[in-house]
Regions:
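Alpha-helical transmembrane segments of integral membrane proteins
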Residues: 97-101, 130-157, 161, 181-305, ...
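Hydrophobic alpha-helical transmembrane segments of multi-pass inner-membrane transport and secretion
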Residues: 104-140, 249-277, 512-547, 575-576, ...
């Protein structure tokens, strides 16, 4: 699977940035703090990226120290200055790129790679067990070959070739399955991300699959091959020495089953943790009502609108949307909720003395009147913005509960003032007229931030706005009417990222959902492989112990006794695997802490449920051979060779 950038269709001089995005923005060549340009350079031979970073960091830090002396930093708080000076330069291989998708999906993909590795180990252990069982059936054949002069090394090579052929065929089948699965995985990603996942065969992936197949075939085929050629010719030629004990392979085969059980339990525990984490995120109250809301973005500056024209366009747009019979209310917001973006700004709060280095940068959003009603965010105190606030004669703002608690404690913030900026002479001329309930901002995982809302027309430096429309019916059915209003006002104005707010919430959980689903699939697959491996060992053991079982039954052992004899061995193998896995899980799941939400890595319920699930699979795998053992005819068993 590879990434294909759909946005990079043309290359233009960076000096044309203003002409390509004519609206006001911080991402300009003149703004020294707006970092939006990536610098590409070719390193000298023998120079690693880490060495280049070590050389560039002192130069970068000197540039930062020079920048904080500029006039535009005069209003910045001490916290902003300190955070700015802590910035570091990043030197990355060009092949990795700087895509947002890679940044967001990096950690989840590493988790999935670890899970895939565990499944591969379980599958390899299973195949090794099957090879050993097959070698046991060929014990006399191998003994005859050795007896007539065949070299052991030649027999090992023959068995290794068989193992490699099996591994390569399995790798080829897996590659075909992966090609089909790629298309299924793409369905987890939103269709409007600026990259496209291609399922076309990649030579590097194919080479890795071939190398992994050959390597696993060698590593996990060598031990069975060596074990198969290490035979006692005298006993093997007489077909003796294994009828009761199960053969010299028994201990190694049981060890492989114990390993499979341990790894499967680790996967099931991980799957349980991810499922419960996703459930916690899905049941989280975002602070607003997601049902029946359509959200989209427009940028009138792309059609040549200026500042006053832009404000008029937005006023007319919201009025026309509210007039639609399908729409209950409509409003604007500068920052789209749950879009992984943010805008913060340094503030000075009236009557609050900031401590040295204290974070005075709440998240900021410019909104229109009715924004909170449209999103369903309750007003806890004071009032909403009105059309009269747009003029700017009286600067007003609304804060959330966390902002109010942080700077005003138990006192009411309504009627108090704050200002944007951190220098001692800043004017605190923005009056707080309301307090709204806390709501999420960037994504569901982050703690609720301190938030400041102002009328977008008072600080409208950005023509691109997000439009929210609460509908009276299914929002998907209202989208056509909403598009008609926008295109009726300006047929050439593009509409970006139109979707329902519920879909926006779902997209914010896209990687959590993908990891939880795939972890569950891998856990189920691992359990199936481990169960098959245990069944194979127990069936082989019952076949080898046919005479013993017949003798026990002839001496009076009941069917229940025979069933328990086999079941006990199966449960002991499971117990040994669980005894290894549970302490390991207690430590290894700590590595997943950053990927979990609302659940401890060592959650007892997840550990217990995973253990019970695997115990049930182990019991079922042991019961089938046990049931067959109980149906053995004692007379026929005593004649068994």
């Amino acid at each position: 699977m590879s990434l294909e950038d759909e946005l990079l269709q043309q290359r233009i001089p960076v000096a044309l940035k203003k002409q390509m995005t004519p609206g006001p923005t911080v991402y300009t060549l003149e703004n020294r703090r707006g970092r939006w340009v990536n610098i590409f350079g070719r390193l000298k031979p023998g120079i690693a990226p880490a060495q280049a970073k070590a050389s560039l960091q002192p130069l970068f830090h000197s540039i930062l120290e020079m920048e904080v002396q500029q006039q535009e930093f005069s209003r910045a708080s001490a916290y902003t200055r300190e955070e700015f000076l802590r910035s570091t330069v990043e030197v990355l291989p060009g092949s990795r790129g700087g895509a947002l998708l890679g940044t967001m999906a990096g950690a989840p993909l590493w988790v999935l790679m670890a899970l895939v590795g565990l499944v591969l180990l379980i599958a390899c252990a299973n195949v090794a067990n099957l090879l050993m069982a097959r070698a046991g059936g060929r014990r006399k054949e191998i003994a005859v070959r050795l007896a007539v002069g065949a070299r052991r090394s030649r027999l090992v090579r023959q068995l290794m070739v068989e193992s490699l052929l099996m591994a390569i065929c399995g790798g080829a089948a897996g590659t075909l399955l992966a090609y089909w699965a790629d298309r299924f995985l793409v369905s987890f990603l939103p269709s409007d991300i600026p990259v496209r996942l291609s399922g076309a065969p990649d030579p590097r992936v194919l080479a890795f699959a071939l190398a992994a197949s050959v390597l696993t075939g060698i590593v996990f085929g060598l031990a069975p091959a060596l074990q198969a050629t290490r035979v006692d010719l005298h006993s093997a030629l007489k077909e003796e020495g294994a009828a009761i004990a199960g053969g010299g392979h028994a201990r190694l085969r049981k060890l492989l089953v114990v390993t499979q059980m341990a790894l499967s339990l680790l996967l099931l525990i991980g799957a349980g943790l991810f499922i419960r984490s996703l459930r916690n995120l899905g049941s989280l109250d975002p602070g607003f009502r997601t049902a029946n809301v359509v959200v989209f973005s427009v940028d009138p500056s792309l059609s040549g609108y200026t500042g006053p024209q832009t404000q008029l366009f937005y006023r007319q747009l919201t009025e026309k949307l509210r007039a639609l019979p399908e729409v209950e209310s409509a409003s604007l917001g500068l920052v789209r909720v749950l879009d992984f973006g943010e805008w913060d700004s340094t503030v000075t709060v009236e009557g609050y003395e900031a401590k040295p280095g204290e974070d005075m940068n709440p998240f900021y959003n410019g909104v229109s009147p009715g924004y909170f009603a449209t999103l369903g965010i309750p007003m806890m105190e004071g009032r909403d913005f009105t059309a009269a606030d747009a003029g700017g004669a009286r600067k007003v703002g609304i804060v959330n509960q966390k902002f109010a608690r942080r700077y005003f404690g138990d006192r009411s913030p309504v009627g108090r003032h704050f200002g944007f900026g951190g220098d001692p002479g800043i004017k605190t001329d923005i009056e707080i007229v309301g307090v709204v309930k806390d709501a999420v901002y960037q994504n569901l995982r982050d703690p609720i931030p301190r938030q400041v809302f102002v009328p977008y027309e008072q600080r409208n430096n950005f023509p691109s706005m997000t439009v929210y429309a609460r509908t009276r019916l299914d929002p998907r059915r209202a989208q056509a009417a909403i598009r008609g209003i926008v295109h009726g006002m300006d047929p050439n104005l593009p509409i970006y990222d139109m979707r329902t707010l519920a879909t926006q919430v779902e997209l914010s959980l896209i990687f959590d959902r993908m990891v939880a689903f795939l972890a569950t699939v891998f856990g189920a697959l691992a359990t199936l492989l481990a169960a098959v491996g245990l069944y194979g060992v127990m069936a082989y053991s019952v076949a080898r112990r046919t005479r013993e079982i017949g003798l026990r039954m002839a001496l009076g052992a009941s069917n229940r006794t025979i069933v328990w004899l086999v079941m006990r061995e199966a449960l002991l193998l499971f117990g040994a695997g669980a005894a290894i896995a549970l302490p390991c899980a207690w430590g290894l799941t700590r590595l997943l802490r950053a990927q979990l939400y609302g659940i401890a890595p060592g959650d007892p319920l997840s550990l217990a449920l995973a253990t019970l699930a695997l115990a049930a699979a182990a019991a079922l795998s042991g019961y089938v051979p046990a049931f067959r053992a109980a149906r053995i005819d004692p007379i026929g068993a005593l004649k068994y060779e």
